Curated annotation (Swiss-Prot):
Keyword Cell membrane: yes
Keyword DNA-binding: no
A Gene Ontology cellular-component term: heterotrimeric G-protein complex
Cellular localisation: Cell membrane
Protein name stated in the entry: Guanine nucleotide-binding protein subunit gamma
UniProt GO BP: adenylate cyclase-activating glucose-activated G protein-coupled receptor signaling pathway; G protein-coupled receptor signaling pathway; negative regulation of induction of conjugation with cellular fusion; negative regulation of transcription by RNA polymerase II
Lipid attachment, kind S-palmitoyl cysteine: 68
Function: Gamma subunit of the heterotrimeric guanine nucleotide-binding protein (G protein) involved in glucose-induced cAMP signaling. The beta-gamma subunits (git5-git11) promote binding of the alpha subunit gpa2 to GPCR git3, which senses extracellular glucose, to activate cAMP-PKA signaling and repress sexual development and gluconeogenesis.
Lipid attachment, kind S-farnesyl cysteine: 69
Topology with respect to the bilayer: Peripheral membrane protein
UniProt region (Disordered), positions on chain: 32-72
């Protein structure tokens, strides 16, 4: 019973991916143009956020790696 449910879930995921691929391929060009600028703005802000958090991120990453090493 559980394996059948998992198979049904996998099928539904594949169907959803196919439906999304069909939808993405059928989007008209003017709609793509109108959707592109809002995507560009968050990417710019995320880049600035990454730059701001990049230097402290190195320190936290080093701490995280030392914690992982001590645990292992």
């Amino acid at each position: 019973m559980e394996t059948e449910a998992l198979l049904n879930e996998k099928i539904s995921v594949q169907q959803a991916r196919q439906e999304f691929a069909n939808y993405a391929n059928n989007i008209p060009e003017p709609m793509m143009v109108s959707v592109a600028p809002p995507k560009a703005n968050p990417s710019v802000s995320s880049k600035t956020k990454q730059q701001q958090h990049f230097k402290p991120g190195k320190a936290t990453k080093d701490k995280a790696t030392t914690k992982c090493c001590t645990i292992s």
